[in-house]
């Protein structure tokens, strides 16, 4: 009996893999992953030297990134493609985590500034009650200095003058927060 055309597939040597073990990836998904890695590479290239030092990169990838930072226009685009290709051959999860940590630190700083601004506004509006809250947060805060700054800020607000003392209150609160952390 002659073999049917589909029977020759059964005789391929080394074909021990079951069909359910194979994971098929579409061409579109591969392209999306490639583009995402290129964007990741571009984000890394846009970082400054200090931030770049905090990201775990091997020597080849770091050299490619430093070269891309010096190149302009079309050469930069090609270099970013090369960086994307290099990232495809590496485990990018530690790089992503370090990048997220850098971005998150900035977001945390913005949130802290908003909290300090709200606390400053409460200090000006409520006075001694808010001072007690500040002293609970930072026991080493100077009560007398805060009272003086609050009194000056209220006078400036009533006289429609620039909020010099309000800025000083914010700076003082920021110093307290930085000394704590």
Swiss-Prot record:
Principal location class: cytoplasm
Alphabetical list of HAMAP family matching this protein: DarP
Annotated localization: Cytoplasm
GO-annotated cellular components: cytosol
Listed GO biological process terms: assembly of large subunit precursor of preribosome
Keywords: Cytoplasm, Ribosome biogenesis, RNA-binding, rRNA-binding
Record-level Gene Ontology MF annotations: ribosome binding; rRNA binding
Gene responsible for this protein: darP
Name the UniProt record assigns to this protein: Dual-action ribosomal maturation protein DarP
The protein's role, per its UniProt record: Member of a network of 50S ribosomal subunit biogenesis factors which assembles along the 30S-50S interface, preventing incorrect 23S rRNA structures from forming. Promotes peptidyl transferase center (PTC) maturation.
Family note: Belongs to the DarP family.
